[in-house]
């Protein structure tokens, strides 16, 4: 075994293996990850119990329905303008029964993340998930992490708080790496191979991407996800974030993390070992498996995801990444190597540019052009060793403002 400190995500270390049912707090309960996690819990009531829910407030009726069905103790909602609507919806469902505790405001999910439970599933989208991630770690909860942005923007902060084995990755690629890494030690690992579907625009040149529309970008060939993540998959920013995440989670240098395009999305990632063997984790595209690993590890949840029908012929293809058409992975490696506030700037600028693209204010190629310009202007980041939460927030605020300025300028020039 290596004498290096254990990585953030280590399949060899069981952080908290409790007997009986596990109490779960679900953050982002009305989103894609949250709804699928709740479905898994409802199918396995002997294994899991959801004790609290948090959501932004965009789907009030669903949040109230989830709370009632799961009989949770507390509900958190970020938007204060929907509190009365939520309270009314809860009263209609609960009748004369006592309502769950209601937490309101931007920090409501963070407060909930520190509440008593076994596991916090952070399914929030975006860097707003950082504070809940830190709160869950500080409170000693097992963290099933689907919110990759919190690790990206606050890597050194997360590493300072997390205990060995405390983080279990939920996204499909890192759940795959996590399982494959269980077959050996870090000293046995030659490289990590992260697979990418290639998105809806695989095979197109940069010039052919110039006229991509919102509808085109949201038509992902293999995964059903929210709009921001779907656009990130189309630009391959999502894959760039996953490269940074793999480095942080598994303590593997960037030059030993490779991205390959696998259109079928059957193989979710691979680990190549020093003896020349490669271990791949494969299932049909479905988030049930990664979610089950996140909240159930080291146990496996039966029938969490569909299995392959090996009696049917299938084709599995692998292609090199087109770095000219999709420069996002290379830029992500660059900011990951810079460290400090650079990943936060990259992520925040991208979030603003994706929002502008979805609103029709920025062309598809303009997303990465603008993000690249913002990263270049940021210059030397605050060092990772001295990084603080205010540093991250300040860098994000600057990056968002600068991205909006550059996006508006690019749009004005295009219309002139």
Regions found by a protein language model. Name each.
Residues 1-416:
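Catalytic, metal-anchored helix/loop core of enzyme active sites in primary metabolism
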């Amino acid at each position: 075994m290596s004498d290096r400190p254990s990585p953030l995500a280590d399949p060899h270390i069981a952080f908290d293996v409790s007997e009986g049912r596990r109490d779960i707090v679900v953050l982002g309960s009305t989103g894609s990850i949250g709804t699928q996690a709740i479905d898994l819990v409802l199918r396995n009531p002997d294994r899991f119990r959801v004790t609290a829910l948090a959501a932004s407030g965009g789907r009030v009726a669903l949040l109230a329905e989830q709370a009632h069905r799961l009989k949770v103790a507390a509900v958190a909602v970020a938007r204060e303008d929907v509190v009365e609507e939520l309270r009314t919806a809860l009263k209609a469902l609960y009748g004369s029964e006592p309502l769950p505790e209601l937490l309101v405001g931007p920090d409501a999910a963070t407060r909930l993340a520190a509440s008593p439970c076994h596991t916090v599933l952070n399914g929030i989208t975006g860097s707003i998930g950082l504070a809940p991630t830190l709160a869950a770690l500080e409170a000693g909860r097992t963290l099933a992490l689907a919110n990759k942005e919190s690790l990206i923007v606050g890597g050194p902060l997360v590493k300072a708080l997390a205990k060995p084995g405390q983080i279990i990755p939920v996204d499909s690629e890192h759940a795959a790496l996590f399982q494959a890494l269980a077959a050996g030690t870090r000293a046995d690992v030659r490289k990590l191979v992260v697979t990418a579907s290639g998105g809806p625009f695989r095979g197109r040149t940069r010039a052919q991407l110039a006229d991509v529309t919102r509808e085109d970008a949201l038509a992902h060939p293999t995964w059903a996800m929210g709009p921001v993540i779907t656009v990130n998959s189309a630009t391959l920013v999502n894959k760039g974030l996953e490269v940074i995440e793999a480095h942080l989670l598994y303590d593997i240098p960037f030059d030993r993390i490779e991205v390959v395009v696998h259109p079928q999305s059957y193989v979710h990632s691979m680990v190549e070992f020093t003896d020349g063997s490669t271990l791949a984790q494969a299932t049909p595209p479905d988030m049930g498996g990664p979610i089950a690993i996140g909240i159930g590890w080291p146990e496996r949840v039966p029938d969490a995801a569909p299995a392959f029908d090996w009696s049917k012929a299938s084709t599995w293809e692998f292609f090199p990444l087109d770095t000219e058409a999709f420069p996002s992975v290379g830029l992500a490696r660059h900011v990951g190597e810079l460290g400090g506030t650079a990943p936060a700037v990259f992520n925040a600028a991208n979030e603003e540019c994706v929002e502008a693209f979805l609103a029709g204010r920025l062309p598809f190629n303009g997303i990465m052009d603008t993000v690249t310009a913002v990263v270049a202007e940021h210059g030397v980041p605050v060092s990772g060793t001295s990084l603080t939460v205010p540093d991250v927030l300040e860098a994000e605020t600057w990056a968002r403002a600068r991205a909006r300025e550059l996006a508006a300028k690019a749009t004005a020039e295009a219309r002139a």
